[in-house]
């Protein structure tokens, strides 16, 4: 039944459109409508929207995660384009966080996206992280990983860790549910890790795509 204003009819059309957008995952018994609702209510912070962060952000936005935060203080460079699929040549020299937010909004206008064109530091990390349910690490340095880890422990939030080098990658989830293992259990000596020489810069473009998708 549609009232004279047509508002009920419009609401039904909007609801049907949302169901069609996510239909291919809603029909999976492991997801269903309840799972899709959880995705739409979720708030995920992605720290670093480069090689790892690009596929992470694209697929979370496509899946309908309701709120994404994007933290990155870097600018788009030509060397990024080989693997950082969020960006294009016309965005060279522009802030990654802002460009990523625009691209993701074009992909899915139904979700909230909050760009933070700044480095995650001890001064801002606590306030930023407390706005989200889960933190996904797409950064490339040990200091930021330890910072994310410690605040996630303090705020009792899951920390999804990822790293890549060459043809290899690592993925783990820390501080989830009753599982109390964290990043410091994997790498207990922070000072030793900070003294390590930087890893080789070489990486195949598909490596972050595979690791980020996991």
Sequence positions of predicted segments:
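Extreme N-terminal basic, low-complexity initiation segments
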Residues: 2-8
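Adenine nucleotide-associated cytosolic modules
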Residues: 12-214
């Amino acid at each position: 039944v549609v009232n004279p204003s047509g508002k009920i009819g419009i609401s039904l059309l909007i609801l049907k459109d949302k169901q069609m957008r996510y239909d291919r995952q809603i029909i999976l018994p492991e997801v269903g409508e309840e799972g899709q609702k959880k995705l739409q209510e979720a708030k995920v912070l992605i720290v670093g929207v480069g090689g790892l962060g690009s596929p992470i952000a694209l697929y979370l936005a496509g899946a309908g995660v309701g709120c994404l935060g994007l933290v990155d203080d870097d600018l788009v460079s030509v060397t990024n384009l080989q693997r950082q699929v969020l960006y294009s040549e016309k965005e060279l020299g522009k802030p990654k966080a802002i460009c990523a937010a625009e691209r993701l909004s074009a992909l899915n206008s139904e979700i909230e996206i909050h760009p933070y064109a700044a480095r995650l530091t001890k001064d801002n990390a606590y306030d930023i992280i407390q706005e989200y349910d889960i933190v996904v690490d797409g950064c490339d340095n040990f200091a930021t990983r330890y910072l994310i880890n410690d605040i996630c422990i303090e705020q009792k939030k899951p920390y999804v860790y990822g790293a890549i080098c060459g043809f290899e990658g690592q993925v783990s989830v820390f501080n989830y549910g009753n599982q109390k293992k964290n990043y410091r259990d994997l790498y207990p000596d922070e000072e030793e890790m900070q003294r390590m020489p930087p890893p080789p810069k070489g990486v195949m473009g598909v490596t972050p795509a595979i690791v980020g998708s996991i």
